């Protein structure tokens, strides 16, 4: 619903109702599907909390602990941080939309649009470091827009979100690219002559202390591990197109509408919009550069996809509803498929083994695993397979 009618329909009360209903849906999905291997890994780590871990910061693990105490060792408890992160994204959309010149309608439409994408609908009920980092990224985007508009206190909000986002997942560093336009926006550049940005920077650095404490205790294995993931191959555009295409896939047909909305926004020259475009594109820019050297995981671009929901809410075009409805239908079908497969995966695999010509038997896992960045894990498992076993 757009235009004057949509603005009248989306009252604050309906906005809160939307958030409540979406959170309920996320909770039902979370409680109804078995946890994955990654989620079990996070659960196991949360039973022995530490400053950080070898391959991840620990914020998502810490947040899991009170829910496990309250709800027991259940899928809902394990996934509660993801449910809360999705709610936080919705809550942050409203002040961000207002900063960009919109109101409740834009925030509500953007949040609804995200539910027409597989990565958000499923990711809101699946605990991961990505969804938590994305919530902090949206908060940091709001702060950057406010800074660009002359709000100096927003540096503290940016520092809080950047620091805690880094404690959620290391790719949060992409948000620093969003600070670049502040160098040529007069109101923002003037703030650099005051102590506030620099003190806020020290505050953000202090919030990341758990990562450095763990690293100092373990010969910096967590940092060295991240540097070891940088590909050493020659330059190629192959993986850039693969990364961008995979992000379109994660957003289903709704992603086509996102791309058109980005194009339509190019004429916005207000300081807030200039800053918003930069911070929204930052993850895609950074990891597309990484993709020049090798494969990167598609979901690292998730903050760009989430903020693209707002981009489309502000810049609808003829035919955008058809694209998003088609994307929503595809996402709903995928959700049903997830329910069917996860109810009894052992039986599904057993049937595939007895029917060599079945679709499942013809599916190649290597393309999927490369898209999400688990090639080494799959190769290790494949080397240990016995005859007739599947990865």
Each language-model region and where it sits:
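Short acidic/glycine- and proline-prone juxtamembrane loop motifs at membrane-interface regions
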Residues: 119-133
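Membrane-interface transmembrane helices that cradle and orient dolichyl/undecaprenyl
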Residues: 98-104, 140-155, 261-268, 316
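Signature aromatic-anchored transmembrane alpha helix within multi-pass, membrane-resident enzymes
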Residues: 317-358
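Transmembrane-helix signature of polytopic, membrane-embedded enzymes
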Residues: 3-6, 10-12, 93-116, 134-135
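Transmembrane-lumen/periplasm boundary regions of multi-pass, lipid-linked membrane glycan transferases
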Residues: 175-271, 285-290, 294
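Specific aromatic-rich, kink-prone transmembrane helix
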Residues: 90-92, 113, 132-149, 157-162, ...
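Short helix- or helix-capping micro-motifs
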Residues: 19, 107-115, 162, 166, ...
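Transmembrane-helix motifs of polytopic, lipid-linked glycan transferases
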Residues: 80-101, 139
């Amino acid at each position: 619903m757009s235009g004057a009618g949509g603005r009248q329909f989306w009252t604050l009360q309906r906005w809160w109702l939307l958030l409540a209903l979406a959170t309920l849906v996320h909770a039902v999905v979370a409680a109804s599907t078995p946890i994955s291997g990654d989620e079990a890994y996070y659960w196991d780590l949360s039973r022995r909390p530490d400053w950080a871990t070898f391959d991840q910061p620990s914020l998502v693990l810490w947040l899991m602990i009170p829910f496990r105490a309250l709800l027991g060792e259940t899928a809902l408890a394990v996934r509660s941080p993801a449910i809360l992160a999705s709610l936080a994204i919705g809550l942050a959309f409203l002040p961000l939309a207002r900063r960009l010149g919109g109101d409740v309608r834009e925030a509500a439409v953007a949040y609804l649009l995200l539910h027409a994408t597989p990565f958000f609908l499923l990711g809101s009920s699946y605990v991961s470091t990505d969804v938590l980092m994305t919530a902090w990224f949206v908060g940091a985007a709001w702060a950057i827009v406010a800074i660009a508009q002359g709000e100096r206190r927003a540096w503290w909000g940016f520092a809080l979100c950047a620091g805690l986002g880094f404690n959620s997942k290391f790719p949060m560093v992409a948000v620093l690219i969003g600070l670049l336009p502040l160098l040529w926006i007069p109101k923002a550049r003037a703030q650099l002559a005051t102590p506030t940005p620099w003190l806020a920077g020290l505050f953000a650095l202090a919030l990341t202390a758990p990562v450095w404490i763990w690293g100092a205790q373990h010969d910096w294995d967590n940092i060295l591990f991240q540097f070891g993931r940088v590909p050493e191959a020659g330059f190629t555009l192959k993986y850039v197109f693969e990364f961008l295409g995979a992000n379109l896939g994660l957003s289903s047909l709704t992603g086509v509408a996102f791309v058109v909305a980005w194009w339509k926004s190019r004429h916005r020259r207000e300081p807030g919009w200039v800053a918003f475009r930069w911070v929204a594109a930052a993850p895609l820019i950074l990891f597309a550069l990484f993709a020049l050297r090798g494969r990167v995981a598609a979901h690292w671009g998730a903050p760009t996809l989430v903020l693209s929901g707002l981009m489309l809410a502000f810049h609808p075009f003829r035919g955008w509803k058809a694209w998003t409805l088609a994307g929503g239908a595809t996402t709903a079908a995928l959700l049903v498929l997830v329910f069917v497969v996860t109810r009894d995966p052992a039986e599904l695999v057993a049937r595939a083994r007895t029917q060599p010509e079945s679709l499942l038997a013809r599916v190649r896992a290597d393309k999927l695993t490369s898209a999400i960045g688990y090639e080494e894990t799959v190769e290790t498992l494949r080397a240990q397979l016995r005859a007739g076993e599947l990865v």
